């Protein structure tokens, strides 16, 4: 067997365990409930609007151009629909495949960065699939997972391979361009710092400094040309307002004086611990990080050149969201895998001490089990005042058993501790998602409301939404006409007078008896309520008058017996 075929055999053997495990758990989890608002339903709404109106160049939502994101994710959804028909199965399978691609690429990058330490490459995918934050966001139809694929591809093109020291600049340009088409210029924040700091971690960059920077600039320009191949026709097709929103508001508005998601500079610091869970509670990982000594290997320098500037730059941006760091999670996984590997290689007390084992994670699992077991007793004693915990109480006991078993599993002696932590984290995170689906399903299921609205649309009735509409009904109801944005006061009165058969969607924080009596449909919606009204009834109530009695009773979801309806006064 040649060296190349042996390497391929070892690579395929490494996939044997973690890849099927990830695919199995992720596919089960992602189909536990329909696409949930707001991220998944909004992405599907854009894809559906483009599809139904045959507008594949410019993303649209609710009949208007959507400048928040570039179109590549929507095109991938359309590719599946072209073969399988319009459905919500393919977009979810696509997200799982994107997650699997991240695992495979992360392992390949770890192998390139640390060719002399095979254990780092073997453990990297286990650490990446174990990151609870990344797994949960990978279950949503979002752009950051796809962006992470292109970021990993770009890094693989920069890092020297076993048979080629120079970067693959054409591949680097293509990955940058695909990143642009996924989420716009923010792709540069993820890849440019590592390229700029190339001479610090790459021998070829030190020896060929001028070529490194010249060809890197050419590759970035090439990626920009890929973006321009879409942007220029899109601008010509959609006009000046879309141009301004796409080129200035979409990216620049998040960088300086953000119009949404404005946070302080330090906001990401506590999120580091959330992003790296469960390993943040594994003492051996911390021991490995603190044991790293200079001079750092080239692979570690590359990871720091990727992670640290990205953290500083995103912290400097005015607009912040936790999932902006999803493309950095593979780098964090490789860094933690390397730290644990080097600690293991050096030997000594820290490499095998039980005090640095998984016991904090086991205690956390036992604590979660105890809470889930206690919820029904607290509920019966009238001690639960939070409706989220109240809804968990009726379905939490089986999950308490699960977390009890996972805690015991983490305390088992023997080898394979890292894989044990990873497997327990993956199953535990999927269990938490299943608990979420069972307990809070009605607050995130848009299908009943979407069917009611679609029926009204089919009859030619207008539909209005009080406040910002994020497309949460568009795909589930296969709706083809825009929903009007409404405002309280005279605007609502005028709209109701103009559309006597129209429906109005409102999102009150609290319900009252009139809502249960006169509304068409009521259901929990995320942390508030969603109420669908006949427009004249709502307008009459807003004037302080009593509307006429409806011939049909109010639809109360998930059921009229739902405990929160009994507390309405």
Give the positions of each predicted feature.
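Membrane-embedded architecture of ER/inner-membrane glycosylation machinery
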Residues: 2-7, 11, 170, 174, ...
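Transmembrane-helix signature of polytopic, membrane-embedded enzymes
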Residues: 11-18, 106-130
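Extracytoplasmic catalytic/substrate-binding loops of multi-pass membrane glycan-assembly enzymes
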Residues: 32-58, 64-76, 86-89, 239-240, ...
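Transmembrane-lumen/periplasm boundary regions of multi-pass, lipid-linked membrane glycan transferases
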Residues: 45-48, 136, 182, 187-322, ...
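Loop-to-helix entry region of an early transmembrane alpha helix in multi-pass inner-membrane enzymes
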Residues: 71-75, 84-104, 141
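Transmembrane-helix motifs of polytopic, lipid-linked glycan transferases
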Residues: 93-116, 153
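Membrane-interface transmembrane helices that cradle and orient dolichyl/undecaprenyl
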Residues: 111-114, 154-169, 179, 340-343
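Short acidic/glycine- and proline-prone juxtamembrane loop motifs at membrane-interface regions
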Residues: 136-147
